[in-house]
């Protein structure tokens, strides 16, 4: 009997030591001197719309003593492409991932599976129709659309009777575009305006979409940076046939079209803040196994030619132009 009790005590002691060793190993890995590696997976990284994003990464990496690896491939067009790249980076030793998700339901489920391996933060956009369950840092897309429409109403003194509007985006199925569109429609309800068409570059029919072939409208509203830049170039070339441009964007080209008078209003999300906060959340998770990452909402600014170079917008323009 005594022998059995002694054996039990020894087993308990050994298990206790093992638990201490495992916890010690976890703490060592999370708080050791080697910096964490964060893989950042985004499309078209050389586009200027990512300038503020990349500058935010640089500053956050310096602040948190973190190695940041940016992965961008021209052929990354589907969620499966994105997942494959993420798996490769995790296999190479990435401790966490920041990703701009390619929105579809299959990709959503695969990202949730990957999050069991390493912490993942989605930036800028999530998934349509239902909550993704992923941690996200993004602006309030609905209110961005609503504020864009509100500026339009202000400029027309609340009277849009007889005015025809065209809405242009790159990905009509993304949650960001869906929410922005709803914000616009809710705000313009009862204004007298008619939305004559709403088209996106990416569509099920694979038909090539361009603004010049759309029915003529009085106002074009572009719901993302690429669409705004394309519409700005069309306005510059008189291919909008006199339509005025309002939209959402965050690149030097977008600011140029506003400053030059080819657009009336630009709503610009703070991409610097988005990625900086993403790194901060991931580092907190890496340093504390029990930390629960938080979704965060970043700010945005309604820019016009009148306030574009004001003191309060200096930092935003600085990060966009980096």
Residue ranges of predicted features:
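Periplasmic-binding protein-like
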Residues: 39, 93-101, 119-123, 166-168, ...
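An alpha-beta-alpha
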Residues: 57, 148-191, 290-310
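Venus flytrap/periplasmic-binding-protein-like
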Residues: 121-128, 224-226, 236-266, 304
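Hydrophobic membrane-insertion alpha-helices, especially the h-region
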Residues: 10-25
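Hydrophobic alpha-helical segments within soluble ligand-binding/sensing domains
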Residues: 136-162, 250-254, 269-287
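Hinge/cleft segment of the Venus flytrap/periplasmic-binding protein
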Residues: 273-322
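Short beta-strand segments enriched in small/hydrophobic residues
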Residues: 27-53, 70, 134-135, 163-173
């Amino acid at each position: 009997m005594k022998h059995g009790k002694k054996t039990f005590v020894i087993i308990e002691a050994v298990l206790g030591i093992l638990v201490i060793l495992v916890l010690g190993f976890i703490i060592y890995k999370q708080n050791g001197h080697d910096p964490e590696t964060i893989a950042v997976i985004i499309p078209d990284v050389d586009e200027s719309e990512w300038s503020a994003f990349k500058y935010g990464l640089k500053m956050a990496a310096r602040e948190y003593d973190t190695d940041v690896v940016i992965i961008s491939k021209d052929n990354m067009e589907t969620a499966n492409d994105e997942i494959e790249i993420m798996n490769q980076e995790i296999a190479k030793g990435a401790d966490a991932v920041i990703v701009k998700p390619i929105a579809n339901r299959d990709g959503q489920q695969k990202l949730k599976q990957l999050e069991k391996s390493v912490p993942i933060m989605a930036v800028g956009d999530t998934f349509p129709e239902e909550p993704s369950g992923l941690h996200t840092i993004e602006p309030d897309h609905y209110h961005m659309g609503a504020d864009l429409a509100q500026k339009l109403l202000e400029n027309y003194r609340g009277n849009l009777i007889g005015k025809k509007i065209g809405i242009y985006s790159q990905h009509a199925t993304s949650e960001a575009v869906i929410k922005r569109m709803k914000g616009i429609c809710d705000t313009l309800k009862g204004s007298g305006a008619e939305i004559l068409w709403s088209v996106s570059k990416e569509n099920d029919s694979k038909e090539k979409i361009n603004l010049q072939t759309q029915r003529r409208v009085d106002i074009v509203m572009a719901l993302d940076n690429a669409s705004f830049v394309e519409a700005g170039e069309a306005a510059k070339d008189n291919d909008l046939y006199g339509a005025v441009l309002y939209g959402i964007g965050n690149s030097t080209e977008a600011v140029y079209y506003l400053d030059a008078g080819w657009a009336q209003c630009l709503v610009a999300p703070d991409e610097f803040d988005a990625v900086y906060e993403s790194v901060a959340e991931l580092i907190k998770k890496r340093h504390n196994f029990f930390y629960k990452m938080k979704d965060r909402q970043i700010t945005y600014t309604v820019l016009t030619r009148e306030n574009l170079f004001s003191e309060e917008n200096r930092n935003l323009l600085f990060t966009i132009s980096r």
